[in-house]
């Protein structure tokens, strides 16, 4: 990620953080994000309006999970207000990185994200989607180190550590629910594996063999793969 992009994200994170501070000072404990799209029913290329209940559509995605380490202990230690500030800085920074890599946020969990790359409706090829997901994970950690944690440290707030997991594979998209309560869900082994790698990772990106095999090759590449259990840790090459 270029220094210019890092600086752009730094400004966005700072705005989100200061907005959260202003909210606290006014004692308005409420969510302040405005989004152009609802995360639910957000599988790329699929809509609840056009799918039938029990539908079975097959697609392929690179799947990324990022999750905060020791988030429960951290929240208990620093308290609700500092957790509130931390999450506004963290989520805004992560969403900017996802956007820069053409990812689609499928879910915002309490302390992390699930993101899809590629698919039938995406302009990205299979290999491009795989590379985008892996590089997104690396850049997420870079933004945490270089943007978010310095901001938190300035206010004596416990720094954030995250793990990232990435896999690629078949995904089944289906519409689940009843007539007035329903959602579009993605199901697949690659989702489970990406989540598993995320749980194992600490301040690193762990990817599957499928990601390793599909990664575009180039001489003097900037990324190398280090074997870890049944996956690989993405590391800087050169």
Regions of interest found by a model, annotated:
Residues 43-48, 147-149:
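Short gly/ser/thr-rich secondary-structure transition/capping motifs
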Residues 120-237:
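Catalytic beta-strand-to-alpha-helix segment of the class III nucleotidyl cyclase homology domain
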Residues 12-18, 34-36, 56-63, 157-160:
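Short acidic/polar alpha-helix capping motifs at helix-coil junctions
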Residues 50-132:
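Catalytic NTP-binding/metal-coordinating core of nucleotidyl cyclase/transferase enzymes
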Residues 1-46, 202-238:
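Intrinsically disordered, glycine/charged-rich C-terminal tails and inter-domain linkers
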Residues 14-24, 40, 68-73, 120-125, ...:
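Short low-complexity stretches enriched in small and charged residues
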